[in-house]
Amino acid sequence: MRGSVIGSGSFGTALANVLAVNCEEVRLWGRESSVVEAINTQHENPTYLKGIPISERVRATNDLQEALVGSELVVLATPSHATREVVAKAQAYLPRHVPIVTVSKGIENGTLLTMTELLEDCLPEEFHPYLAVLSGPSFAKELARRMPTVVTIASHWDKVALRCQKALQTETFRSYTSTDVVGVQYGGALKNVIAIAAGMADGLGMGHNARAAIITRGLAEITRLAVRKGANPLTLSGLSGMGDLVLTCTGELSRNRHVGMELGKGRKLPDILADMKEVAEGVKTARSAHELELKTGVELPICHQVYLIAHEGKSARTAVVDLMTRQPKSELAGV
């Protein structure tokens, strides 16, 4: 079996390592020539996964055609804001009747499309039944080090999810299938916004009680919006919902939590982002969440405050006060 991964950041590289267990060859596409060369000559990605060995079955390339032709499984691991551009360039080389799995956790600014909706918008209908999404609590460094990781793979067509599950199953990587493409994607995207809020609380020194409240009430607003968009509420209590949310709000490797912590300490967002090698998806997703709140009328108070802090310059401490002094409600309001 031959697999392809588009995107040579930390998560794309880690998934290429997973695929290499069951594939004779994995082609990994990346923009950065230095990363491609290092993977091919040193079997390491020193830019994004320094010190972690990459399987010799993984072959990196800057050429999309070389990466895709003849593949039996395609993983799209580009940042959400770059997915449309990359897919437009890759379309001519995408194999037919092969699962295409997106692992990007975002909602496109402006269009408010999830990643599978974006792919449906970009690709001819013949590709649509083969689209899938992989999401769940999965830090790239732990995945690459073959530490136990469990995720959800969702597709409208169960046979596609099962094909992906089989290709990715290893002794240290397990997946569960789902047909709730909507719930899996909203859980994966919006938890990044909530993680920024949790990080801000930590940066402000507000304690464990505050963090637990943000996680719990964050899950409530993610669920409200996801259900409005057609999700099964039970999906949000699973790996791609609560599981990913807890990890991203508490883990030391969380980029979104890091952004929040630095904002809580008073740093400016452009300075924080300038110091980061990889994308914190929650920053852009906060804008999409704000637009979705206005469009749907679903209350997203935590996401709203993150948007105001990240994009309108509001003080993190003032945002906490505003959240705490909102009108009292039933815990199940809006459910």
Swiss-Prot record:
Q: What positions constitute the catalytic site? A: 191
Q: Which GO terms describe its biological process?
A: carbohydrate metabolic process; glycerol-3-phosphate biosynthetic process; glycerol-3-phosphate catabolic process; glycerophospholipid metabolic process; phospholipid biosynthetic process
Give its localization.
Cytoplasm
User: Tell me, what is one Gene Ontology molecular-function annotation carried by this entry?
Assistant: glycerol-3-phosphate dehydrogenase [NAD(P)+] activity
Tell me which EC number(s) this protein carries: 1.1.1.94
Q: Which GO terms describe its cellular component?
A: cytosol
Entry keywords, A to Z: Cytoplasm, Lipid biosynthesis, Lipid metabolism, NAD, NADP, Nucleotide-binding, Oxidoreductase, Phospholipid biosynthesis, Phospholipid metabolism
Pathway(s) per entry: Membrane lipid metabolism; glycerophospholipid metabolism
Coiled-coil residues are none
Q: Which residues bind NADPH?
A: 10-11, 31, 105, 140, 255, 279, 281
The record's listing under Pfam families reads: NAD_Gly3P_dh_C, NAD_Gly3P_dh_N
**Per UniProt, where does sn-glycerol 3-phosphate bind?**
105, 136, 138, 191, 244, 254-256
Database matches in Gene3D superfamilies: N-(1-d-carboxylethyl)-l-norvaline Dehydrogenase, domain 2 (1.10.1040.10), NAD(P)-binding Rossmann-like Domain (3.40.50.720)
What is the superkingdom listed in this entry's lineage?
Bacteria
Instruction: Provide the reaction this enzyme catalyses.
Output: sn-glycerol 3-phosphate + NAD(+) = dihydroxyacetone phosphate + NADH + H(+); sn-glycerol 3-phosphate + NADP(+) = dihydroxyacetone phosphate + NADPH + H(+)
Q: Major place of localization?
A: cytoplasm
NCBIfam families from the entry?
Answer: PRK00094.1-2, PRK00094.1-4
Q: Which family does the similarity line name? A: Belongs to the NAD-dependent glycerol-3-phosphate dehydrogenase family.
Record's function text: Catalyzes the reduction of the glycolytic intermediate dihydroxyacetone phosphate (DHAP) to sn-glycerol 3-phosphate (G3P), the key precursor for phospholipid synthesis.
Q: What is this protein called?
A: Glycerol-3-phosphate dehydrogenase [NAD(P)+]
Taxonomy, top ranks, is: Bacteria, Pseudomonadati, Myxococcota, Myxococcia, Myxococcales
Q: Which gene encodes it?
A: gpsA
